[in-house]
Amino acid sequence: MTRYEVVFIAIPTLGNLVPQVEFANLLTKHDPRFSATILTVSMPQRPLMNTYVQARASSAANIKLLQLPIVDPPAPEQYQTLVGFLSLHMQNHKHHVKHALLNLMKTTESNSSNSVRLAAIFVDMFSTTLIDVAAELAVPCYLFFASPASCLGFTLDLPRFDLAESKSEFTVPCFKNLLPRSVFPNLVLDAKDGTFWLSYHARRYKETKGIVINTLQELETHALQSLHNDSQLQRVYPIGPILDLVGSAQWDPNPAQYKRIMEWLDQQPLSSVVLLCFGSMGSLEANQVEEIAIGLERAGVRFLWALRESPKAQLEYPRDYENHKDVLPDGFLERTNNIGLVCGWVPQAVVLAHKAVGGFVSHCGWNSILESLWHGVPVATWPLYSEQQMNAFQMVRDLGLAVEISVDYRVGADLVRAEEVENGLRSLMKGGDEIRRKVKEMSDTCRGALLENGSSYSNLVSLIQELTS
């Protein structure tokens, strides 16, 4: 029997690495002929990444995680944005990726008991410089896109936008409605190197043999049809939702806090708690924290608030506060003691699955949106960075699957007032029956897509047929 090896590599962010690892897990479980090697890239500024990798390596079957040697980071004068840094950082790993692939090819060739073939390498959205290595070694290369299909379409269309125009709205084929300039990513609006790198990667996407997207046909029907109409693209495979449903519960950096959170949730009524969580890279300034606190207190809803301190350095993740009283209004914790819990890092996937949780104030990272839809928990949108403003716009305006607190918020430039927070929370937790119904329907649809003969299941079968042909 011929066996197949697939290789994956992603930038060192949880939002990109985790879904890629889960896709490798899905692929190898679906077809036991496949095994996977994940090439991981370390960043000393992000120890949480190493915690995840070590935990996943010990629990993964048929998946091997291989740490690439550490390389010198790009010099500060070489980049202006995080995407610029990450793109160059991945480019600097070319030699080590080539060495790893050559070793894998030698191993597969020397396997006398079974025929083993290196079937493909999957790069992520900011690792396209590694397509050169795949081409040099004649290894089929695919793109694994961890963001929505709408974001992929926007990125591919980016070169045709004239941002010097004074237009406030743009026609973007992957969106049903005109897309406001105000929800464009900061990378595009800032006069830095972000647009260059996004356009560079978009051009290279078209060199891959196919694009695997963490979405499903029934969720992003319009965007996926738009991509299908692009004759320059190879086949697109929507195979989601790909989720780590255990999440950080299996590698939580603070097990005592995890226990405290879950015990508190166990004591709350059904669907009564709103989770406020802004992702692994999300944090807010002190004046915004104060407005949220006032809005929460006025709304009177039960809440679990993952409140984290802004990073001290550019490439670091936020960290837990030593004392939340340092940033919250005087007496807030005491006044809300009976209805709320303020904490640091939360095991988001497990919390969203808890029966007490009935709403989610989210930064609208795509993984978080998919988790909320899977568990049937309605979202109130509060985007912070990356493509999250566009995700929020799509969820609220195009799909009608979310309540709006903001769709175009930007840290440091905007302030959502306590009244807006209060109104958004009330709408999410005490109204929004139509959105709640639609989210529950989409939850059932997400689960059905992964079952035999479901849309994502069928696309995975088609991908496997191509990989093994």
Curated annotation (Swiss-Prot):
Which residues form each disulfide bond in the chain? none
Activity regulation, per record: Inhibited by Cu(2+) or Zn(2+).
Q: What is its EC number?
A: 2.4.1.-
Q: Which Gene3D superfamilies match?
A: Glycogen Phosphorylase B
Q: Which domain of life is it from?
A: Eukaryota
Say yes or no: keyword Nucleotide-binding present: no
Report a single Gene Ontology molecular function: UDP-glucosyltransferase activity
Positions with a binding annotation for UDP-alpha-D-glucose: 280, 345-346, 363-371, 385-388
Give the UniProt keywords, A-Z.
Glycosyltransferase, Transferase
What does the record say about pH dependence?
A: Optimum pH is 8.0.
Any Pfam family from its record, for instance, is UDPGT
Q: What does this protein do?
A: Glycosyltransferase that catalyzes the C-glucosylation of daidzein to puerarin. Shows activity with the isoflavones daidzein and genistein, but has no activity towards flavonoids such as 2-hydroxynaringenin. Can use UDP-glucose, but not UDP-galactose or UDP-glucuronic acid as sugar donor. Does not require bivalent cations for activity.
Matching entries from PANTHER family are given as:
GLYCOSYLTRANSFERASE (PTHR48048:SF81)
Family statement drawn from the similarity comment of this UniProt entry: Belongs to the UDP-glycosyltransferase family.
Protein's UniProt name: UDP-glycosyltransferase 43
Native source species: Pueraria montana var. lobata
**High-level lineage:** Eukaryota, Viridiplantae, Streptophyta, Embryophyta, Tracheophyta
